[in-house]
Amino acid sequence: AWTLFKRGNDARRRNAIQLVYTLDIDLRNEADVLERFAGDKDVRPTPDMAYRPPVVAPEGWSGKRPVVIGAGPCGLFAGLILAQMGFRPIILDRGKVVRQRTKDTWGLWRQAKLNPDSNVQFGEGGAGTFSDGKLYCRVKDPRFLGRKVLEEFVKAGAPDDILWEAHPHIGTFRLVTMVESMRRTIEELGGEYRWETRVDDLELERLPDGNQRLRGLHLHDGSFLEADQVVMAVGHSARPTFEMLHRRGVFLEAKPFSIGVRIEHPQSWVDQARYGKCAGHPDLGAAAYSLAHHASNGRTVYSFCMCPGGRVVAATSEEGRVVTNGMSQYSRAEFNANSGLVVGIDPARDYPDGPLAGIELQRHWESLAFEVGGGNYHAPGQRVGDFLAARASTALGEVVPSYKPGVTMTDLSRCLPAFAVDAIREALPVFGRQIARYDHPDAVMTGVETRTSSPVRITRGKDFQSLNVERLFPAGEGAGYAGGILSAAIDGIKVAEAVAASIVSAR
């Protein structure tokens, strides 16, 4: 008997693409076969990928319930694992349940009305809900925690092909129903959600060694929630929370992120460039790409969060600012392909003035983008040909941008740092030699892309607790320990295990 273990493709020769299958085969004489093929890298034992929780709640446990702040992928899986272990977590989120959040998000896209607490960044499912739903990452995963994540997603309604596709994705609409299903699972296991609940402050006590210990949380309505273990899974856009943590003396440090634009091409162009005569084959689907260029000014330009057959979306969470991101549905069937085209920046060179300086840098360029776009949440846009020629765009060409509520054609150099403009101008022709028509004059760029990752790290130790605040467990992308849905979910599992271990050891 056999089952499909992994499916991908080898597209290095675009007119001779190979589909690559890895099979899991049951053999009566497995040991003999493995010995015979001992030198063959393509034949190996099937790994044991079953998840086994390292601890569970003691029978009759009735201690203080752990608290998870944030209901994105990290908080969702931290809450799920704690619930499965028997610890009945309380999950707080400043946003709303996913269906109401979706309505609020469409309010920005259709009517240019922003709800600062319910948008692409905040609410059930986190920022990953409005994305391509990519479910692969580059983090080392010796315990196969990523498999646990995928299996839970399938239980919640995801297509089972995510278990074997080499580059699985879900898409926005499916993520909506999945997070609802997982919420019900957590509640059935004794967990509790509290929506539209913002944490405004921490209650800390000073310890003899100079560090601090968390006692509880002050909430926006004036109430106090006592807690001995708190998972801080707030996401990369929780700027007021980062500012509050800094005021409270929680150890933070600035970390690198990137800034740039979204670039759009017809998906058919990308398919033809990547797959040649095989473009359109149903087993290949919409083509993706990954590009990088080290520019002469010392900067690295790279594609980020590429969304085949998707759209560019308004992703701001603060009034008077414009932010772009990309989103696809499971079908990846929309007309354009889009990707971030971003330039790496780092604290030492670009924002050396403290742990929150990266946030102020983001705000500066997002505010300029809002102004250049017309002050109405329209994004500033520019044709690639005009961008390369250093002239403002006044009209569209063959490619129509997908960003809503609208795009104002202009000069993107007005809302990007000069080093980023120079690096992207240098990179575009290079990428055009790798992906035909990538630098086509009518390709469209919209700005600005600033939320590639968290601009801060809430540094933690080997016990997953804050370096100087006991019982505070920084987690996920907002804390600087993940990037994307899968890595954030994996980190949520690891932190949940650390929380559970601390509860059991304290008894």
Located regions from the model:
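Residues forming the flavin
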Residues: 1-19, 23-507
